[in-house]
């Protein structure tokens, strides 16, 4: 029955995604001028993703081979292993890694494929009405969201079914064999987000600084040689990268929850059996609640609509509230159905996760929408120049990390104690796992909102480049400003769910040490080696961020140099703006090629850093521990310190960078909206000094 429900719900998800895709493709694809712009975006996005996936393929094969060797030949076996034959263990872990990596690549490609076909239809929809464009953009994002969530559920459930069918191990140990699926998904997501992120921001910086600030031309102006690269970046970074990111989050957290569920059932087997609760229901509980959440999100997507007078963000929020409410109902049914008399506390844990997700959405909107104080304060700071804009943005970003951390902390402690008081032994971790599942319950709708951002951004670019009427651009600008907020809140949502999951994964690391014969009940930071490990973890976050930002800067410099080269033959007016001649034809392909090569080149070093650092630290301090005759901290304890402090620092850094970027972007949009007034009542618009300062902050 459990498998029937999981696979049945997945079939509904696939059918709905196909329905949405066919509905979108049946819409008008606009004028001939629109189609020319769209074709250029398609070509650039597909070329980049093809080259990026080829690079990831080689890295994944190398890593999979290393995993097989380590598990099959280098690692000593123990009685807790799911299979006794080490070669068989290595083979299953390697295969699950490759399947997770492949599904993650497909998730990213799906996101990009649908987005580059939805953006032109959103632009064409804006010719009709704001509501038409809104519905097309959201449903395009939803098609991606449902396919990604379904692919995750099907991948894990399918692998579970195959291993169970061949009898490779007992049912309760199957989650240990599919752990590689989550690692494969994380591996691909890391490089997909790095490559896509570097591409996106480098193209954006190059297009804005030379186009808006130096040349004095509008955003997405067809005379800007970097504008196509900028629009391509929205697809490969925000659509493909985020699709792989959400897939990775769901995969890792579902598998982690299944492993914890297995341990919970084994430790409380008599209590479960006396209550008539079967092991499959407990093990597959994470997939079941995800399936309920997907169906709930389906309803949320279908009810979204607006009129010309309403703030379109209200329509998106309505859909999210409906999805959240129906997901809570799904949690109730799943807990009552599969957890027997222990259902109430775990249902409340799921509600904790859903409420946490809601709070994260509210907080991100508060810090990134220009309807609220933080973004407006940055716009006000722009009146005195770029320096004060940057100072104000950094201050807002730092402030924005406080309340989310308090929210995560409250969610972890509440869910843990609800689990502990459920009547089952050692159920605190499972309570936290269920809260994490609650946060991910509306993942399909959240991913729809995330993809809404780059789709509307591209639609605005297509409208501008095809020289549509100003009234059409006003509609896409309104949707684009919303998209900046939805992108930011989705990233905040991902950080929040990762924060809850980090607690689970760290506990899983300690369990693995216990199974391997090196139990570690606590991490003692008073030991100098462990303290050093913690400092190295925090350093890793800053070093990784430095490499990523430097990569963006390096790639952006190349783009800026190319755009300036193409503008060099043009005259400048007394105002400093460039005077364009009728025969000037920008070379879009040159900028696309430059930023593609730079992104693929620059993504390897930061990616390798985060993969190799824990291994190097563990091996180094293991050698030091052995050389000291067993005195001091073991290498595994030092790595625990690195993971613990590194995770905490990473959460804070992610919140800071995400909200700062979203706030700067919408501060610029606020100035461009024509509603920004200084204390004297003077309106500041595009091309004003305040706008130029806001553009610097945005880039």
Language-model features: locations:
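Hydrophobic packing and interface segments
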Residues: 1-699
């Amino acid at each position: 029955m459990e498998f029937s429900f999981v696979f049945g719900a997945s079939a509904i998800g696939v059918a709905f995604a196909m329905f949405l895709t066919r509905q979108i493709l049946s819409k008008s694809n606009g004028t001939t001028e629109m189609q020319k712009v769209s074709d250029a975006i398609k070509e650039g996005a597909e070329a980049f993703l093809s080259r990026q996936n080829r690079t990831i393929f080689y890295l994944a094969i190398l890593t999979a081979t290393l995993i097989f060797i380590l598990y099959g030949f280098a690692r000593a076996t123990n009685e807790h292993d799911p299979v006794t034959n080490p070669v068989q263990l290595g083979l299953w872990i390697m295969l699950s890694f490759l399947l997770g990596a492949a599904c993650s690549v497909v998730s990213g490609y799906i996101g990009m494929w649908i987005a580059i076909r939805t953006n032109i239809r959103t632009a064409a929809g804006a010719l009709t009405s704001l509501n038409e464009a809104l519905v097309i953009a959201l449903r395009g994002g939803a098609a991606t969201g449902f396919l990604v969530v379904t692919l995750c559920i099907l991948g894990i459930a399918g692998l579970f079914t195959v291993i169970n069918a061949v009898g490779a191990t007992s049912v309760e140990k199957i989650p240990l064999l599919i752990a590689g699926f989550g690692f494969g998904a994380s591996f691909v997501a890391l490089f997909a987000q790095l490559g896509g992120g570097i591409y996106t921001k480098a193209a954006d910086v190059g297009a804005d600084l030379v186009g808006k600030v130096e040349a004095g031309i509008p955003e997405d102006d067809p005379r800007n040689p970097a504008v196509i690269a900028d629009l391509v970046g929205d697809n490969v970074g925000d659509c493909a990268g985020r699709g792989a990111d959400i897939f990775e989050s769901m995969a890792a957290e579902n598998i982690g929850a299944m492993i914890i569920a297995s341990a919970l059932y084994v430790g409380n087997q008599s209590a479960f059996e006396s209550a008539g609760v079967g092991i499959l229901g407990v093990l597959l509980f994470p997939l079941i609640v995800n399936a309920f959440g997907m169906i709930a999100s389906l309803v949320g997507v279908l009810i979204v609509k607006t009129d010309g007078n309403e703030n379109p963000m209200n329509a998106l929020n309505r859909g999210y509230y409906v999805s959240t409410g129906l997901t809570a109902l799904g949690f109730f049914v799943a807990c009552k159905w599969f957890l027997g008399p222990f259902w109430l506390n775990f249902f409340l844990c799921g509600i904790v996760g859903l409420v946490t997700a809601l709070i994260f959405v509210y907080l991100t909107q508060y810090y990134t929408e220009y309807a609220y104080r933080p973004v407006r304060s940055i716009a006000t700071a722009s009146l005195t120049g770029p320096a004060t804009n940057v100072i104000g943005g950094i201050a807002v970003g730092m402030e924005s990390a406080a309340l989310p951390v308090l929210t995560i902390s409250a969610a972890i402690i509440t869910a843990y104690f609800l689990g502990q008081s459920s009547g089952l032994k050692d159920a605190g971790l499972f309570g936290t796992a269920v809260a994490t599942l609650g946060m991910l319950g509306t993942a399909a709708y959240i991913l729809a909102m995330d993809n809404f951002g780059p789709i509307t951004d591209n639609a605005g670019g297509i409208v501008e480049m095809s020289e549509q009427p100003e009234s059409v651009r006003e509609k896409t600008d309104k949707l684009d400003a919303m998209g900046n907020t939805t992108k930011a809140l989705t990233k905040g949502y991902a950080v929040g769910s990762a924060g809850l999951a980090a607690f689970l994964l760290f506990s899983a690391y300690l369990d693995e040490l216990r199974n391997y014969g090196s139990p570690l009940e606590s991490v003692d930071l008073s030991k100098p080696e462990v303290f050093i490990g913690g400092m190295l973890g925090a350093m890793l976050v800053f070093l990784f961020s430095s490499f990523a930002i430097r990569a963006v800067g390096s790639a952006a410099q190349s783009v800026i140099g190319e755009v300036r080269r193409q503008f060099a033959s043009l005259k400048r007016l007394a105002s400093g703006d460039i005077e364009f001649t009728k025969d000037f034809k920008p070379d879009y392909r040159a900028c696309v090629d430059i930023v593609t090569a730079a992104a693929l080149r620059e993504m390897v070093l930061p990616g390798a850093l985060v993969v190799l650092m824990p291994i190097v630290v563990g091996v180094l301090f293991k050698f030091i521990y052995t050389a000291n005759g067993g005195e001091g901290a073991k290498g595994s304890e030092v790595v625990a310190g690195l993971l613990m402090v590194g995770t905490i620092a990473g959460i804070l850094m992610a919140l800071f960078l995400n909200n700062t970027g979203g706030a700067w972007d919408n501060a610029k949009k606020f100035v461009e909206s024509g509603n920004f007034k200084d204390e004297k009542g003077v309106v500041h618009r595009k091309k004003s000094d305040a706008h130029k300062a806001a553009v610097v902050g945005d880039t």
